[in-house]
Amino acid sequence: MNIFNQLKQDIIAASQQLYNNQEIANTATIETPKDSFNGDLSSNIAMIIASKESIAPREVALKFKEVLVTLPYIASIEIAGPGFINFTIKAESWQAAIKDILQHEEKFFEIDIDKNSNINIEYVSANPTGPMHIGHARGAVYGDVLARILQKVGYSVTKEYYVNDAGSQINDLVSTVLLRYKEALGEQITIPIGLYPGEYLIPLGEILSKEYGNKLLTMNDVERFKIIKSLAVEKMLDLNRKDLADLGIKHDIFFSEQSLYDKGEIEKTVKLLESMGLIYEGTLPAPKGKVHEDWKHKVQKLFKSTNYGDSQDRPIEKADGSWSYFASDLAYAKDKIDRGANHLIYVLGADHSGYVKRIEAIVKALGQEKVKVDVKICQLVNFVENGVPVKMSKRLGSFASVQDVNKKVGKDIIRFMMLTRQNDKPLDFDLVKVKEQSRENPIFYVQYAHVRTKSILSKARELMPEAYNSFKEGKYNLSLLSTEEEIEIIKLLAAWTKTLEASVKYFEPHRIAFYLINLASKFHSMWNFGKENSDYRFIIENNQELTLARLALASVIQKVIASGLEVIGVEPMVTM
């Protein structure tokens, strides 16, 4: 049985029995206490009921204890702190969890949660101005793994890349390619500061020179701009797609910002918001740091962003009368909603943390409070090689590209390491350490655990074929898995789907990497105990019954590690 789910259902039933209220129990949590002294599982149900019924939490907890302590899988119940109910589960119930995983593998890896959402998740959305640098890899991996997890548990998910092909950086890209075109024609050039000096744009100049000769030089500015922009954006997007594909990332949609202008979508969105009374003409206060007397108050069209929790209303026009970036963000969000999305997730870099409130305001307004929105920020990656920081700047022409790092360490290492810290915390990525074969290298440690579990099963088939066949037929006595180390591993295995569920609930894929590292650590510890004491070995040739039970344990460890690696897009290794 799934102990977490069973306890939750029993708490809901007890809530109905004691307080005629099972709905409130659905909000209660079932967690694994950080300190094993507090039992195996803990719930906050008493505090939730107490708040609703205006009763002391400990009084509520004691009533729940009277009902729940009679359950056959409960060994004991203790009340802690302000009213936490701590449960100790009987060993045989944990052992039964292993049998449940082996006999109902597909069902075990399913999660029963509300899936009535059509989710659009936008991530990466890097300006198509050059090869993708490693700084974008974190958001790319985070967004991709989050999408994979959501899809795994049954959500409808659209993975989207917003192509910023209408901004000033595209103008700079076109200017740089024009210079490379002139260079291809034999002209001596100098790339001014502010443009893109990297050699990756040289081939674009050569393509243009072969196709047009010197015709572009005499062409009018508007026509020439369109030709160069079309080629440059296409080639840079091809480059970015390949960089992402090499990381195992594939978006469903690449959405052009320019298309919003070309199709008049911004005008349509503004008219809609005007009809809703959300656009007005007004002035904004002086920005922080500006002397009030020096600030020129300009009447402009503003969106009532403060109606939805933003710190100030947002201009939808620039000083020259053209649409602001915010205006295109409005139209883009409307397009997503019009396509049927009822939950928008934006994955942004640390440099866009100031956009959170305004994006939330956009979606709340256009979705009329019926569309969910989550904005997740990925903090910076401190990327070093041999202790020396690597500069990451397209404009300087020197940066660690995704392609370069991929060639050095491979996509699996990049994907795993980008999940070794919570997304909103800075991450250190050391190229040397990620290639070490030591316990200090988390990806190696997890993969090595998977390899070892596979080797246990292979060795058993070779040394004890009769026992191995009995294991495959399900002839094992799991009550023999009774050591403290074995029970601790089983508890962790039983918590796998709970970990996956939490990753979905809180949009925190790093929980999976943390879980795998923890599981690998406990497995390796037991393996090492076997080196010191033969009674702890997984294969004991003179004890077939215990070997059968431990083969079952090794098999489940292997399946869970493989499932965890696969859901984050990392291929489980079979040999090293």
UniProtKB/Swiss-Prot annotation:
SMART domains: Arg_tRNA_synt_N, DALR_1. It is found in: Cytoplasm. InterPro entries: aa-tRNA-synth_I_CS (IPR001412), Arg-tRNA-ligase (IPR001278), Arg-tRNA-synth_N (IPR005148), Arg-tRNA-synth_N_sf (IPR036695), ArgRS_core (IPR035684), DALR_anticod-bd (IPR008909), Rossmann-like_a/b/a_fold (IPR014729), tRNAsynth_Ia_anticodon-bd (IPR009080). A motif ('HIGH' region) lies at residues 126-136. One of its GO terms (biological process) is arginyl-tRNA aminoacylation. It catalyses: tRNA(Arg) + L-arginine + ATP = L-arginyl-tRNA(Arg) + AMP + diphosphate. CDD domains: ArgRS_core. Pfam families: Arg_tRNA_synt_N, DALR_1, tRNA-synt_1d. One of its GO terms (molecular function) is ATP binding. Keywords: Aminoacyl-tRNA synthetase, ATP-binding, Cytoplasm, Ligase, Nucleotide-binding, Protein biosynthesis. Its EC number is 6.1.1.19. Monomer. Belongs to the class-I aminoacyl-tRNA synthetase family. This is Arginine--tRNA ligase. It comes from Rickettsia typhi (strain ATCC VR-144 / Wilmington). The gene is argS.
